[in-house]
């Protein structure tokens, strides 16, 4: 019996790995490189669920990917941060980033209330839009006690919208006159994922990409204080409602902070850093596959339309406001 359970666990884990690896490699191909590995992974998982059903007997391996590998990926994500660079070179951008995070969450909740959408998904999308997309959503989902299908829907939506917006940014840069500093800063402080920032910022050249990444990594850095604030808010609401549910600091966020400090104070060989970043990406993709397998088409039909409209409106407002502020500061 134990050997059968282990076999089913390995098959479930292997399923998420194979789809993740395929998505990772497919995203390097022309056209698909604009779509992104996250979007590809989630779409394949949802389509698999639709045509083949959820592989219940292999659920232990799939659940391992959606929980433990996801948390491990977030811990390694901290290696992208160098706190001295963000506070030093990116201090002006960091000030904008604070406004971006606050605006994204507040605007998302405001529009969601007008549309009468799902508040939990709106919160996840607000954090994802303001901070760093899928990784931020995955980091705060346990704090909000979100269901896996809501987390998957939120990640799928933000991956799709971020890809579309990054392509729109490149078109705007090609058509209109804009300095590399303005374009890079605008991309960094307003696009959803690091991959989206790299796609759009890289189109403006190496100088634009450098400032774009500084702007984006400042938002990733803000995940640390944001999660502390959210935990305190949830604890207050929990005690106010006499709830017995205890809100604790997720251990993987502590790991995220430790990795950020390690990358700041320790010189890590670039080869090792690249390997760890690839491992982080694969683990994150495996988690996305596992989360996507929990989403049925009826969930998308019933729960995704209003959040999709909400994030489009919020992203347009954020992009417009961010451009005005960046243009004023860098022109």
UniProtKB/Swiss-Prot annotation:
Task: Specify the protein's topology with respect to the membrane.
Answer: Multi-pass membrane protein
Q: Which GO terms describe its cellular component?
A: plasma membrane
Print the keywords alphabetically.
Cell membrane, Membrane, Transmembrane, Transmembrane helix
Q: What is its main location?
A: membrane
The transmembrane residues are 9-26, 31-48, 69-88, 93-115, 122-144, 154-176, 183-202, 217-234, 247-269, 273-295, 308-330
**What Pfam family does this protein match (any one)?**
Cons_hypoth698
The keyword Transmembrane helix appears for this protein: yes
Extract the InterPro entries matched here: UPF0324_pro
Q: Where in the cell is it found?
A: Cell membrane
The entry's family comment says:
Belongs to the UPF0324 family.
Protein name, as recorded: UPF0324 membrane protein SAR0338
Origin organism is Staphylococcus aureus (strain MRSA252)
């Amino acid at each position: 019996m134990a050997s059968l359970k282990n076999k089913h666990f390995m098959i479930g884990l292997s399923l998420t790995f194979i789809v993740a690896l395929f998505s990772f490699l497919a995203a390097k191909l022309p056209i698909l490189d604009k779509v992104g590995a996250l979007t590809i992974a989630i779409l394949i998982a949802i389509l698999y669920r639709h045509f083949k059903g959820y592989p219940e007997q292999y659920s232990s391996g799939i659940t391992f990917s959606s929980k433990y590998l996801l948390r491990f990926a977030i811990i390694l994500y901290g290696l992208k941060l160098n706190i001295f660079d963000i506070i030093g070179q990116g201090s002006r951008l960091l000030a904008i980033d604070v406004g971006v995070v606050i605006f994204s969450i507040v605007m998302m909740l405001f529009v969601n209330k007008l549309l009468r959408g799902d508040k939990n998904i709106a919160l996840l999308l607000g954090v994802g839009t303001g901070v760093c997309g899928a990784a931020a959503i995955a980091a705060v989902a346990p704090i909000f006690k979100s269901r896996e299908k809501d987390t998957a829907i939120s990640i799928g939506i933000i991956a799709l919208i971020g890809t579309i917006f990054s392509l729109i940014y490149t078109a705007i840069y090609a058509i209109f006159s804009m300095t590399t500093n303005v374009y890079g800063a605008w991309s960094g402080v307003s696009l959803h994922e690091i991959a989206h920032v790299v796609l759009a910022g890289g189109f403006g050249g190496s100088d634009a990409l450098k400032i774009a990444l500084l702007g984006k990594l400042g938002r990733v850095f803000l995940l640390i204080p944001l999660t502390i604030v959210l935990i305190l808010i949830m604890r207050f609401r929990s005690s106010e409602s006499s709830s017995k549910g205890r809100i604790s600091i997720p251990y993987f966020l502590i790991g995220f902070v430790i990795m950020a400090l390690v990358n700041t104070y320790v010189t890590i060989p670039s080869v090792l850093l690249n390997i760890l970043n690839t491992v982080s990406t694969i683990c994150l993709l495996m988690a996305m596959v596992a989360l996507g397998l929990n989403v049925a088409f009826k969930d998308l039909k019933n729960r995704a339309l209003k959040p999709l409209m909400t994030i489009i409106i919020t992203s347009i407002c954020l992009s417009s406001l961010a451009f005005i502020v960046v243009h004023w500061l860098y022109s």
